[in-house]
């Protein structure tokens, strides 16, 4: 690798790539140069090739993901396919869309130290670097925690910390805000500001755009594997709302987003919670809560990462048993088995609930007498029809999310619970999911 700073740190020269056995998700004739210290945001609809860009830079293509690659990807003037993986890992740090896939340890401190440890650093340096990382990123409260007991947002923070501890020159972030609450997104923005101030090169594949407008030097818009536009933040802000929606992109200014006026709901409650207390490993998560919900009502449950939203959702569906109080449906008590039969939950990490070998089969998996007409219509409405023969594990994160939502629409349950249903979704998919939820409620 070249000594000192290279003006062009990353280069794509006529790059095309297609995954083995897949028609979608590849790239076509990509030409792009990224300078050292630059922050570049990649945006576009789910499956447009954002994640593929990051896999080409960190060497996972072609060393892990198989397919047909044409053109050259260079880092520091060297073709990435010729650089040993251990050298790439020392220079390029990756935070994946699903942080669970990059964890190697069961506790947070060991995970943060894992990359440095593999570089055979002295033990004292490991300790100092973990402490410095926790201080810089303000995650002291996450130290010495069991990773499996963290919320999705907390896992995302540890994944970023494990990369930060290695001090790479290049950061690759794939949907880094997908599991974060508003406060944590602001913290992420400050972390990105910090590494940019340190002169790091940052590539971000993201659907949430608003928090990056002051950080990105350039914004690259991808469509069906091709670069359709490269903008400065100022140029991007001046896109009309109609242009942005046509491109399938979320808002760049949250002040422009106003929720619709809620419909009046019949006051007769169908679901009731009375004096419910939830515990996890003898620790009280939520205490003495009550809830009354009418038929057709859509209720949003909000709170910070780790506040108990997922535990509450799991309790509603009968998946969390350590609870006290009453759960009633139409005035009749429901124990956890009854709640399991009446409800369906789309989890925050949908990889836990995709079992079939095709999208089409997933839509009838475990469902008695599935309505095939409804299944086909739902796949069409969520833009999944072209992928009906694809294995769910070959889809992008946003596409997997839509598959899980599609199953919830088809299963015929009375109570649907969605845990972060819009994480990883582009604008089109987000509005489609919102429309389906509203239609089901009606």
For the regions a protein language model found, what residue spans apply to each?
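Helix-to-loop junction immediately C-terminal to a conserved catalytic motif
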Residues: 58, 317
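Conserved ABC transporter NBD signature motif
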Residues: 66-78, 325-339
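Conserved ABC ATPase signature
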Residues: 146-150, 154, 391-395, 399
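Catalytic Walker B motif of ABC-type/P-loop ATPase nucleotide-binding domains
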Residues: 171-174, 416-419
């Amino acid at each position: 690798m070249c000594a000192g700073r290279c003006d062009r740190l990353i280069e794509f020269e006529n790059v095309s790539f297609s995954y083995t056995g897949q028609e979608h998700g590849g790239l076509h004739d990509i030409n792009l140069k990224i300078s050292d210290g630059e922050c570049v945001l990649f945006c576009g609809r789910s499956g447009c090739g954002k994640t593929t860009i990051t896999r080409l830079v960190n060497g996972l293509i072609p060393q892990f993901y198989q397919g047909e690659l044409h053109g050259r990807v260079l880092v520091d003037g060297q073709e990435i396919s010729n650089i040993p993986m251990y050298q790439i890992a020392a220079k390029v740090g990756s935070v994946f869309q699903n942080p669970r896939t990059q964890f190697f340890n069961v506790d947070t401190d060991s995970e943060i130290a894992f990359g440095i440890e593999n570089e055979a650093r002295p033990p004292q340096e490991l300790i100092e670097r973990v402490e410095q990382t926790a201080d810089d990123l303000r995650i002291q409260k996450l130290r010495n925690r069991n990773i499996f007991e963290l919320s999705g947002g907390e896992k995302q923070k540890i994944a970023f910390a494990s990369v930060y501890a290695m001090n790479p020159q290049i950061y690759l972030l794939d949907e880094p805000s997908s599991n974060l609450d508003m406060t944590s997104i602001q913290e992420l923005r400050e972390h990105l500001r910090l590494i940019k101030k340190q002169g790091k090169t940052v590539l971000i594949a993201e659907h949430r755009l608003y928090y990056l407008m002051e950080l990105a030097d350039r914004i690259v818009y991808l469509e069906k594997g091709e670069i359709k536009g490269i903008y400065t933040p100022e140029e991007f802000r001046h896109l009309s709302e109609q242009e942005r929606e046509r491109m399938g992109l979320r808002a760049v200014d949250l002040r422009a987003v106003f929720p619709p006026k809620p419909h009046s709901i019949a006051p007769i409650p169908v679901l009731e919670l009375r004096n419910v207390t939830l515990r996890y490993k003898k620790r009280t998560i939520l205490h003495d809560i009550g809830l009354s919900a009418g038929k057709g009502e859509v209720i949003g449950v909000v709170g910070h990462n780790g506040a108990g939203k997922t535990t509450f959702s799991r309790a509603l569906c009968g998946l969390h048993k350590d609870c006290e109080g009453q759960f009633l449906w139409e005035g009749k008590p429901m124990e956890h088995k009854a709640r399991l039969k009446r409800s369906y939950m789309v989890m925050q990490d949908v990889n836990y609930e995709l079992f079939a070998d095709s999208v089409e089969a997933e839509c009838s998996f475990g469902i008695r007498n599935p309505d095939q007409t409804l299944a086909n219509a739902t796949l069409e409405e969520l833009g999944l029809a072209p992928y009906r023969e694809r294995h769910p594990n070959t889809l992008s994160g946003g596409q997997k999310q839509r598959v899980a939502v599609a199953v919830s629409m088809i299963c015929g349950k009375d109570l649907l619970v969605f845990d972060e249903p819009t994480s990883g979704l582009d604008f089109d998919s987000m509005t489609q999911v919102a429309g389906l939820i509203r239609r089901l409620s009606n």
